Amino acid sequence: DVDIGVNFESLLELNTNQEKLDELFSELEFKPMAKNFSKQSPAAKEASKDLQEKSPVKSNNNYETLFTKKGLKDWANKLDKCKVFAIDTETDSLDTVTANLVGISLSVKEDSGCYIPIGHNYEGCPKQLTLEEVIHEIGIAIERNKEKAVGQNLKFDIPILARHGIILDKFHADTMLMSYILNSTATRHGMDKLAMYYLNYETIKYGDIAGTASKQISFSEVEIDIASNYAAEDADITLKLFNKLDELLTDKPNQVKLLKELEYPLVHVLSRVEQNGAKIDKDKLKEHSKELSEKIADLTTQAYKISGAEFNLDSPKQLLEVLYEKLKLPVLKKTPKGQPS
């Protein structure tokens, strides 16, 4: 037997201070661990209720699908009268250069919205409004109310709309960028994630209506009745997110200034670059490359002179030998394996 300094009694499970544990998990935002470690005692439930993921909220939606010019006129009137509206596009591709517009969704009030199908194509598909009809009514209304427009990732929607005759050269807000400004360290700012995080709402997923992997179909092939609920929800949730995020930004003037003066103007710049590319002066680029090469060569010569010998600057092993063994520089930090870092 080997004495390892541990006895059997010390390995017994002790009582957990669930309230302290829940408090710690809440502070550190360890939601999965909170669920795994919770004993679900009444006290534990109360202490960690903010960490428990509730059943997703279901809205009493009032969505409509527009097939008539009268419907377009009614919604054009709504855009004129509202303070802010959400807009979203549905396409048959994620490539803004080649994607075709399949439909437009709008929302002027929470728990309501409309979908305007334009490019659905499947057997038995009902007659849709033409692009020209939509532009004549809704397109013009969108343009004259553009400064009320809110979207989620408008860098995608703006070029899609532009290629189909609707110019959105100004807008009110982008919820994806609002989320980024509020929480720049978050890894995801997509609508589905934001809806769950800020609204506790589980959205309809694209895979739910169009399939996944090899069985996935184009949005243009999705039946309009099914597509409409998905698309209108996108606009509705975007409007809800805007209202929530706008409230969170009310006491953050610096972030709002950054949004309006940098992030929002940059949307148009990046959109144009993606559509048109960027011009590069080949001669200037070669000249700059030559300057950098000369500078690198000069710095390399200096490094050899200081070390007293030539070595491979790209080799971490040789760098360690030169810096810490030959030049005796102090080791300020080490790697987990004990090597100078």
Predicted region positions:
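Conserved beta-strand -> loop -> alpha-helix junction used to position metal-binding or nucleic-acid-contacting
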Residues: 167-184, 191, 198
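Conserved nucleotide-binding/hydrolysis micro-motifs of P-loop NTPases
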Residues: 155-158, 177, 186, 318
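Amphipathic alpha-helical transducer elements in NTP-driven molecular machines
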Residues: 132-135, 175, 188-192, 232-235
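Short, basic/hydrophobic alpha-helical segments
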Residues: 130-146
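Acidic beta-strand-to-loop metal/phosphate-binding motif
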Residues: 86, 146-154
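Catalytic cores of nucleotide-enabled group-transfer and carboxylate-activating enzymes in metabolic
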Residues: 88, 134-138, 173
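Short Gly/Thr/Asp-enriched flexible loops that form oxyanion-binding sites at enzyme active sites
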Residues: 157-165
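Conserved "right-hand" nucleotidyltransferase catalytic core of DNA-directed polymerases
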Residues: 1-122, 143, 186, 194, ...
